[in-house]
Swiss-Prot record:
Its EC number is 3.1.3.5. It comes from the Bacteria. It catalyses: a ribonucleoside 5'-phosphate + H2O = a ribonucleoside + phosphate. Nucleotidase that shows phosphatase activity on nucleoside 5'-monophosphates. This is 5'-nucleotidase SurE. The gene is surE. It comes from Clostridium botulinum (strain Eklund 17B / Type B). HAMAP family: SurE (MF_00060). A divalent metal cation binds at residues 8-9, 39, 95. Keywords: Cytoplasm, Hydrolase, Metal-binding, Nucleotide-binding. Belongs to the SurE nucleotidase family. It holds the Pfam family SurE. It is found in: Cytoplasm. Its cofactor is a divalent metal cation.
Length: 251
């Protein structure tokens, strides 16, 4: 297949290099990623702003690669519409840290995959838990899992309007219990604001403590139990359970 690989951690991130190396063994790949770190940029795109694109060379990879001054969703757009032809699959990642629960609403990684689905291209987002005090993570187990999913999806399940969101726990590969297909859980943050300076503007540094809600059958729960999780996502936010009741009240 012709696969577009992107992320939100940037073109120099370890995760995207590991993913590209793994996928290039069986597929034709092109890498289009942000030039700088763009985590938590959600589904933002560049409007009325020139987009700069530069060809890059990723060590150890013999494929076309481009860095883009813009957002992860911009990268997917440019990859599909400008830099490549006939893309069969978009894979976004491997993200440094989970994109599970309601964190997916903030995620540039997931949004880059959803952008692919908006263009009618089957898409996958892949993320791995990390130890945040380290920057030498080994993403090979996440690459192995996404490769398994791609192999099976190519044979049995490639749908143009569906994103497969995969999360891999940060445990030894032999200790992973398997893969669970499940719904997303709910996770919120208690945000704290620390005043750094006060002049014309008050300048704050924010930090967040995660209030993780682990419910049975959710990705948050299964990740805590040592499973890889896979959740099918769609860009339609319609609350269909409430649609008829809201119609009765407001129409």
């Amino acid at each position: 297949m012709n696969i577009l690989i992107t992320n939100d951690d940037g073109i120099s991130a370890r995760g995207i290099k590991t993913l590209a190396e793994k996928m290039s063994k069986k597929h034709n790949i092109i890498v289009v990623a942000p030039r700088e770190q763009k985590s938590a940029s959600s589904h933002s795109i560049s409007i009325n702003i020139p987009i700069k694109i530069r060809e890059e060379k990723i060590e150890g990879l013999d494929c076309k690669a481009y860095s883009l001054v813009g957002t992860p969703a911009d990268c997917t757009q440019a990859g599909i519409s400008l830099l490549a032809k006939g893309i069969d699959l978009v894979i976004s990642g491997i993200n440094r840290g989970f994109n599970s629960g309601t964190d997916i609403l903030y995620s540039g990684t997931v949004s880059a995959a959803i952008e692919g689905a908006l263009y009618d291209v089957p898409s996958i987002a892949i993320s791995m838990d990390v130890k945040w005090d380290r920057d030498d993570e080994d993403y090979s187990k996440a690459a192995n899992w996404v490769s398994k999913v791609v192999d099976l999806a190519e044979k049995k399940y490639l749908k143009k309007n569906v994103v497969l969101n995969i999360n891999v726990p940060n445990i030894n590969e032999e200790d992973i219990k398997g893969l669970k297909v499940c719904k997303i859980g709910k996770s919120t943050y208690k945000t704290e604001y620390v005043l750094l300076e006060e002049d014309n503007d008050k300048v704050y540094q924010t930090s967040g403590v995660r209030n993780q809600v682990e419910k049975d059958e959710s990705d948050l729960y299964f990740l805590s139990q040592g499973y890889v999780t896979l959740t099918p996502l769609h860009f339609d936010f319609t609350n269909f359970k409430e649609l008829n009741e809201v119609k009765k009240i407001f129409e």
